[in-house]
Structure formats: structure tokens, C-alpha cells
A protein has these predicted regions:
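P-loop NTPase switch module centered on the Walker A-proximal segment
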Residues: 1-101, 105, 145, 218-221
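Conserved nucleotide-binding/hydrolysis modules and their immediate coupling elements
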Residues: 212-316, 326-328, 491, 499-550, ...
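P-loop NTPase catalytic nucleotide-binding module
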Residues: 1-16, 103-224, 235-245, 252, ...
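Interdomain boundary/hinge elements
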Residues: 39-43, 153-165, 203-214, 250-264, ...
Length: 608
């Protein structure tokens, strides 16, 4: 009987690259989830193409293992504040959290965000110090830093009394003892499994009570339609059972019938004849499933309050592509197709907001950060969409007639030699130094509070200032009074004056004017940005110029044209680079930059 099933529900929290997905791989392997004949893929939890490429987790996902007769549901949470909507939903399904921290780096801002949410929900943490076998590991420092972090985030005394497990995800072992560096500890992950069984509370719901199942995530299948994922708080659910769906206690009760009930086993979804309290289930057959609704008993409805999600902090305009090259590379180019795709995204991307503007073909899309919105753009681009987007703007709040803006907490890990340049750049962007911590090995950690506006476009500058050796991460802190104007881009751009194809001869002539974004034989059009000017003003250039051929021969060989390689234009770079009067043109094959007004005369008129 499912009512007697021993269940534990845990979420795994970690900063990017601290080893969370590798750790989950090991838990699946060692619990016997993969049969001997199965091929085990690395990073099984990152199953979205962009997640695998970037090594980040975007979508909250579930898997389950069985250890000593107990069914353990593992929810993989995104470590990034931009996917906070995913985080909040994932945490609503669990009773405990495993906080995974790199033994060398210590707690990072993204970890802080998810941990704060988990502690506020009253979840008890288990600290896993990962990668303890790597050189430079500082397990003691990490445990103390985690304690200080929990204390700062308002943890209770019970939450501060957390168990610690030392582990190496890649080598597949864990231990409750710190041991000497280089010493081989426990042979497997049993120390971590046993800690979870001991410290994560078992489900206390009554299987005979009216059903309460809150939907925390949605999936879609072409065969069965919408699929809801959530945890049963109380009661029992069975296939073909009549239920009602309610949006919180004041919501209208919509009748429905459950078709199938599935549970997680490893990475697979298996059909169940019934499921009881504590189980994370997937149900289908009900059309009105949305995130946060409660599926409850039709005779005695017992709805739960709707899930709360933080409001968006950043907004962008998505527009129909109106450039002369529009429609050549994409399959979906009309405003109706873009609008329908954004509406579909809203069904499962709860932190997103979309609204129509007064101008035809322009939609305002609000999200939790630059990464949140550029991942959506990248997904749409891969699906065959073509569009143009504006520079991101922050979402201001009006408090008693005064303008308030979002403030971010930034942590930068840099080499000491780059400290001056980075501090100057953050200072110019209205950043306030909160903390500075040298690690005694030539690197220093800077903590700043800075308006979110000041961070738009800062990533590229930061990488240049630190020669690619710096690490930076940021997290939303609070809304505060507007901090005043922040300067824009320091350099102007090179703008094409004509439609056509760019030639090597023209590139050679423009080489000393600045850095180019285009290569020989690329198509260009009037108003397209072809490069960065070496000065602070915009310059209109002839990018389609060819060499005039005459019937005179010249003595000596012609000079070889020297061309500096162009800047690789990515979607993120483009979105960070542009100013208010510019757009990024996105197609499945290309990313181009352009002026909002393509003709020089229109630009002059608009600037008056």
C-alpha cells in the first residue's frame, strides 16, 4: 500500500559549478537506479540543450531513488536568481534541503538566494562540503561561512544545528568525518543517504483526509495534454478519480477527472494505482491545471493558498523583425506567432510577465534578470523564430510618489592586480563597497551593492578588466530610492550607409576605425551596426565599398590587406552592448545589431 510507504522529499541547492548535477548522478548510480546494462549519461539532470551547453540548471526537475526501503524524491533546483520562479516551486514540494558547497570557494550569492527561500519556509538544511579532495580545499572555512550565512539569513536555532557531510561527487564517496587531506574516506555515498533519512522529516499527512495536491510544475505531452507535477499534502489520489481544481481558498471549484497517476522512479515516470501523502506525482487528464492550483476532493474541497513568486525586475521589448533581411532565415516571423509563443511560455514560466504595448508588433516581456530573458530568446531562436529586441530596462516601483529601483548584491572574485580597475568601474556605476576579503593567495573577493541598471552591460566590461580570470555573480537585494543617472557605453558604433555585401577591401579600409562585428561576404543594410568605433561618437561608413579597377597596371605587387578578426557576436553580448536607440536582430542563424531608425535622416530627426 502506498500509504505505508516511507518517503523523504529533498531539494539540492548549489551554486553554478559546485557539483550538484554530478552528485545527483552518483546518488542515482549507487542506489541501483541504473541497471547494469544501462548506459549512464553524465549530467543526467541537465536534460535541456542549453543546460548541457552552459552547465547551468534552468528548470526545476525531479528524480527519485530508493535507499534501504525508503523512497527519496530529489528535486534539482536552479542555482540562479533569474530562475527564482522555478526555485520557489521546487521548494514547495520538499521537507528538507541539501546545501552543496564547493570546499574551496565557499558559499556564493546564488546559493544565498535559494537558501534564504528554503530557511524562510522552515526547511532544515543538510550541509554537504563537496570536492574536499581537490587541492586548496578549506572545509573548516566553508562550514563556518555556511553557519554565518544561515545566521545572517535569519535561521532558527534548530536550523543552525545542521549536520555536515564531507564528499567528493566525482569520485562518489561521502563521510561524516573531515579526515586529513588526501586520505581516502568512505567508499560510497551511504553517509549522505543515511544523513538524509535521519534528518529530513517523514511525511505526516493523513491518507484518509480529503485530497490536497498542489501543482508546482507543468509539463506537456502531445498524447495526454497538460501534465501537472506536485506533492500530495494529505489524502489519496487514484486514476479515474473525480476531483476539483481551485485557485486558493477563494477560487472557483472547477470539476475534473484524473486520467493517469505517475510517480518518479529514478529518471523514469511509472504508473501508480494510487498515491498517498508525501508522494510527488504527475497527473494528467485535467485541462485547467495551472501552477499553484490545488487539486482537491470533490466532496470536501480543501484548497491550499496559491504559490507566491517574486515580481520581475527587468523588462525588454520583443518586436517583429523589420530589417531589410527579415524573413530570410526564420520560420516564424509574424507578431501573432511571437505572441502565441510567449503565451505558451507563460503556462510554465511563472516568473515571466507579458503584455501588449500601444505599438503594433511590440510586446513588453518582464523577467527576473538578463539570463532569464536571454534563455527564453535562445530557446525561441532555436525553434525558428525571428525578431528584434530592445535594451533591457529595470522595473521601477512608485513608493509614496518617489521612484524606487532594484538594488543587486554583487560578489566579484578577482586577482589583486585587477582590483583597482574593477572597483573604479563599479564605482562609476553607483556601486557601494560592502565587504573586501583577500584570500591570501593573490585573489580578493569584493562585495558591492549596486543598482540593477548599473549591471546591464557590465559582464563584458568585467571580463575585459580581469582578462577573463574574474568570477562575478549577483542577486536581487531590495528596492531603494533612485540613485541618479548612470553613464552609458563609452564608445560609439560604426553604421553601414548602404545595403549590400561587405567586401575585404572595405574591411581593410575600416580596420583602423575600430573593431568589426562582420566578416567578408556578410550581408549588411543601411542602419546596421557593423563595428565599434574607436571614439565616442557614431560614424556612418561605406561598408560595401569595392576597389575601383582601371586598365592601368601598377608597378610592384598589390599590398596584402590586413584585417583584425571580428568580435564574435553572441545573443548575450548583443543584449548587453546596445543602447536605447538600438536593437538586436535575432534569427535562427544570425545575431545582428542595428539602429532603431535605419535612415540617417530619421535618426537626426529622432534625436532633436
Amino acid at each position: 500500500m502506498s500509504t505505508q510507504k516511507q518517503i523523504r522529499n529533498i531539494a539540492i541547492i548549489a551554486h553554478v559549478d559546485h557539483g550538484k548535477t554530478t552528485m545527483v548522478d552518483q546518488l542515482l548510480r549507487q542506489s541501483g537506479t541504473f541497471a547494469d546494462h544501462e548506459k549512464v549519461v553524465d549530467t543526467v539532470m541537465d536534460n535541456n540543450a542549453i543546460e548541457k551547453e552552459r552547465g547551468i540548471t534552468i528548470l526545476a526537475k525531479n528524480c527519485a531513488v530508493t535507499w534501504e526501503g525508503t523512497h527519496i524524491n530529489i528535486v534539482d533546483t536552479p542555482g540562479h536568481a533569474d530562475f527564482g520562479g522555478e526555485v520557489e516551486r521546487a521548494l514547495s514540494m520538499v521537507d528538507g534541503v541539501v546545501l552543496l558547497i564547493d570546499a574551496q570557494e565557499g558559499p556564493m550569492p546564488q546559493t544565498r538566494f535559494v537558501t534564504k527561500k528554503a530557511l524562510a519556509l522552515g526547511l532544515k538544511p543538510i550541509l554537504v562540503v563537496n570536492k574536499v579532495d581537490k587541492p586548496g580545499a578549506r572545509p573548516d572555512f566553508v562550514v563556518n561561512a555556511a553557519f554565518d550565512l544561515f545566521d545572517k539569513l535569519g535561521a532558527t536555532d534548530e536550523q543552525l544545528d545542521f549536520p555536515v557531510v564531507y564528499a567528493s561527487g566525482i569520485n562518489g564517496w561521502s563521510s561524516l568525518e573531515e579526515g586529513a587531506p588526501g586520505e581516502q574516506w568512505g567508499p560510497d555515498m551511504s553517509a549522505l543517504f543515511n544523513t538524509v533519512l535521519k534528518h529530513v522529516p517523514a511525511q505526516k499527512g493523513d491518507p484518509a483526509a480529503p485530497l490536497q495536491l498542489q501543482i508546482s510544475a507543468l509539463d506537456f505531452s502531445t498524447f495526454v495534454g497538460r501534465i501537472g507535477v506536485g506533492r500530495i499534502s494529505q489524502g489519496t489520489i487514484k486514476p479515474m478519480m473525480d476531483v476539483v481544481v481551485m485557485e486558493g481558498p477563494d477560487g472557483k471549484a472547477i470539476k475534473g477527472r484524473v486520467n493517469q497517476v505517475l510517480t518518479f522512479q529514478g529518471l523514469e515516470r511509472v504508473q501508480a494505482t494510487e498515491a498517498g501523502p508525501g508522494e510527488i506525482v504527475l497527473i494528467n487528464g485535467i485541462a485547467d491545471l495551472n501552477i499553484g492550483v490545488t487539486v482537491t476532493d470533490s466532496a470536501n474541497p480543501a484548497p491550499l493558498p496559491m504559490l507566491k513568486v517574486d515580481e520581475p525586475t527587468l523588462t525588454m521589448n520583443f518586436c517583429v523583425n523589420t530589417s531589410p533581411l527579415a524573413g530570410r532565415e526564420g520560420k516564424f516571423v509574424t507578431s501573432r506567432q511571437i505572441w502565441d509563443r510567449l503565451q505558451k511560455e507563460l503556462q510554465h514560466n511563472v516568473a515571466l510577465r507579458v503584455k501588449e504595448t500601444d505599438e503594433e508588433g511590440i510586446f513588453e516581456v518582464m523577467g527576473r534578470g538578463e539570463l532569464h530573458l536571454t534563455i527564453l530568446l535562445e530557446n525561441m531562436r532555436r525553434e525558428g523564430f525571428e525578431m528584434a529586441v530592445s535594451k533591457p530596462r529595470v522595473v521601477m516601483k512608485d513608493v509614496d510618489g518617489e521612484k524606487f529601483e532594484p538594488i543587486e548584491l554583487v560578489t566579484a572574485d578577482i586577482e589583486e592586480q585587477h582590483q583597482g580597475g574593477v572597483m573604479q568601474a563599479l564605482g562609476e556605476r553607483k556601486g557601494e563597497l560592502v565587504n573586501m576579503e583577500p584570500d591570501g593567495r593573490g585573489r580578493v573577493r569584493l562585495e558591492y551593492r549596486i543598482p540593477a541598471r548599473g549591471l546591464i552591460g557590465f559582464t563584458n566590461e568585467f571580463l575585459n578588466l580581469t582578462r577573463g580570470s574574474g568570477l562575478i555573480s549577483n542577486i536581487f537585494d531590495s528596492y531603494e530610492a533612485h540613485k541618479g543617472d548612470i553613464g552609458g557605453r563609452k564608445q560609439g558604433v560604426l553604421i553601414s550607409m548602404d545595403d549590400g555585401e561587405i567586401f575585404t577591401y572595405a574591411l581593410g579600409k575600416l580596420d583602423d576605425r575600430g573593431r568589426m562585428f562582420v566578416r567578408a561576404n556578410d550581408p549588411v543594410y543601411e542602419g546596421m551596426i557593423v563595428g565599434i568605433h574607436s571614439r565616442d561618437n557614431d560614424l556612418v561608413v561605406n561598408a560595401t565599398r569595392t576597389k575601383q579597377l582601371t586598365n592601368f597596371r601598377v608597378s610592384g605587387k598589390e599590398d596584402a590587406i590586413k584585417i583584425t578578426p571580428p568580435i564574435e557576436l553572441t545573443l548575450e553580448y548583443g543584449v548587453e552592448f546596445i543602447e536605447d536607440d538600438e536593437l538586436v536582430e535575432i534569427t535562427p542563424k544570425s545575431v545582428r545589431l542595428r539602429k532603431r531608425h535605419l535612415k540617417e535622416s530619421d535618426r537626426k530627426r529622432a534625436s532633436r
